[in-house]
Swiss-Prot record:
The active site is at D73 (proton acceptor). Its EC number is 3.6.1.9. This is dTTP/UTP pyrophosphatase. It is an enzyme of class 3 (hydrolase). The lineage of its organism: Bacteria, Bacillati, Bacillota, Bacillota incertae sedis, Caldicellulosiruptorales.
Amino acid sequence: MKKVVLASSSPRRIELLKQFGIKFDIVPSNVDEIIDPDLPPEKNAMNLAKKKAEEVFRRLGESAKDSLIISADTIVFIEGTILGKPSNEEEAFYMLKKISAKRHTVFTGVCIIDDSCRQILVDFEKSYVYIKQMSDEEILRYIKTGEPFDKAGAYAIQGFGSLIVEKVEGCFYNVVGLPLYKLNTMLQKLGYDLMKGEL
C-alpha cells in the first residue's frame, strides 16, 4: 500500500480525501502563506502548494521515502486583488463587502510529490463564484458564525456560507479547497487512479 501524506490540516480537504477510502497521514506544512503581488493568482496558488509539499517532504526525511505527498493552496481573486484569510473581524468585513454582489475567481494550486518515481507535478484549477448582495447587517451576522476566519476570501461554500453563494461556474470542489477532478487527473499521470482504488 502506498504511503500517502496530506500536507494540510484543512478539515475540508481531509473530508474530501477520506471519501475515497484512502489511508493517509495528515502532516500540516509550516510554510508562511506569503503572496507575491507581482505574480498572477494561479502562479501564487501553485507556488504555495509546491512549497507546502516540499517543506513536508523535507521535514519527514527518511520516512518520506517512496511516499506520495499531496498539498493544495486556495486563493480568492477579485478586481485585481488577492484575498487571503482574514485575521480579524474588520478584515473579514472588508473582504465580504468586496465580494458582495459580484463574481470572483477561486484558484487552487495542487502539488503532488511522488518520491517513488522522483516526480513533482504542479497544476491549478479555476472556478467562478457569484455572491449575493449582502447588507452590512448580513455580513456582520455571517462573521458572528465564526466561519470566515480560516477561509480565503472570508467565506466557506459549505455551512452558513452556502446561503450567500448564488452560483458556481466550474469545479465546486475547487471552491471547497481540493479540486478532485484535477487531483485525479494528476494522479493518473503518475499511474494512480482514485476510481480504481489504487492508493
